[in-house]
């Protein structure tokens, strides 16, 4: 399923659509359908041009982040409640040990800073850092931001679905331990849902929340987003001139919407 999601995501992406259009145009030209090839080629160029413009970020990117703004501004860490743990989703840091001993901060590295801010503000002591190679890539920056290593737990996962399932298993185990009495028999009584502050990029939060609602229903999730990249970029205006950064943002946004819609259909 992991690789199927990757393939489908590429095929419906702006770049995937552009490649498909180009291939169809070439095939039509080779078959002698030159007029049709020109039309398809022109539409493909227009398609890619559109997705490379900042104006499309307003259409597909900004709506992903809007509900997480408070009066049009990024919420302060002081506004979030105290919780049992901070769940820091992966995808913001990376490391290639064959190349360097130091991790690279990607565009979503604000997530790590947000988790550290929440920790230092006393919102939760435990930080669960997820992702592929989270210890190697993320621990160093968390420690630089003042989070003690003893407060950090790591969960290897390749995508958001695996992160939600893994965090759910961690808390199922914790709840079981809490409700065991001295004889090792599970005691009866009301089970209180553990509360976590979910930290990820604002544009990713809608889909992440859906995954946690499905795969970790025993957890109360409070969204604590960082990295409002779409909203920040959209502040630059409604330009229709193409640029590579807009193509990147819009491709990310389309990927998120495909995941959200796909989840709704599969649910």
Task: Indicate residue ranges for each PLM-predicted region.
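Membrane-embedded alpha-helical segments of integral membrane proteins
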Residues: 1-29
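Hydrophobic alpha-helical segments of integral membrane proteins
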Residues: 3-8, 56, 60-64, 254-261
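Hydrophobic residues within the alpha-helical transmembrane core of Major Facilitator Superfamily
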Residues: 23-24, 49, 261
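Membrane-interface helix-boundary motifs at transmembrane edges
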Residues: 29-37
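Hydrophobic membrane-insertion alpha-helices, especially the h-region
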Residues: 39-54
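A structural signal for short, hydrophobic/glycine-enriched beta-strand patches
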Residues: 50-246
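Structured C-terminal subdomain patch of bacterial secreted/periplasmic proteins
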Residues: 244-267
């Amino acid at each position: 399923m992991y690789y199927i999601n990757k393939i489908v995501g590429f095929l419906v992406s702006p770049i995937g659509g552009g490649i498909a259009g180009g291939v169809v145009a070439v095939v039509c030209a080779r078959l002698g359908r030159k007029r049709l090839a020109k039309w398809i080629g022109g539409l493909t160029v227009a398609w890619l041009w559109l997705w490379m413009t900042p104006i499309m970020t307003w259409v597909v990117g900004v709506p992903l982040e809007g509900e997480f703004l408070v009066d049009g501004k990024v919420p302060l860490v002081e506004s979030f409640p105290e919780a049992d743990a901070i769940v820091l989703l992966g995808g913001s840091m990376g490391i290639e040990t064959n190349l360097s001993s130091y991790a690279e901060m990607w565009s979503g590295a604000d997530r790590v800073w947000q988790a550290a801010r929440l920790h230092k503000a006393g919102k939760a002591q435990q930080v669960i850092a997820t992702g592929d190679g989270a210890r190697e890539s993320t621990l160093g920056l968390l420690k630089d931001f003042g989070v003690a290593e003893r407060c950090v737990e790591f969960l290897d996962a390749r995508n958001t679905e695996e992160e939600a399932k893994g965090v759910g298993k961690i808390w199922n185990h914790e709840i079981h331990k809490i409700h065991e009495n001295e004889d090792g028999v599970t005691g009866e009584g009301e089970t209180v849902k553990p509360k976590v502050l979910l930290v990820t990029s604002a544009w990713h939060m809608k889909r992440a929340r859906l995954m946690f609602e499905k795969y970790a229903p025993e957890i109360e999730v409070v969204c604590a987003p960082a990295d409002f990249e779409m909203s920040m970029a959209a502040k630059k205006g409604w330009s229709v001139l193409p640029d590579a950064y807009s193509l990147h943002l819009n491709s990310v946004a389309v990927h998120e919407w495909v995941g959200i819609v796909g989840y709704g259909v599969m649910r």
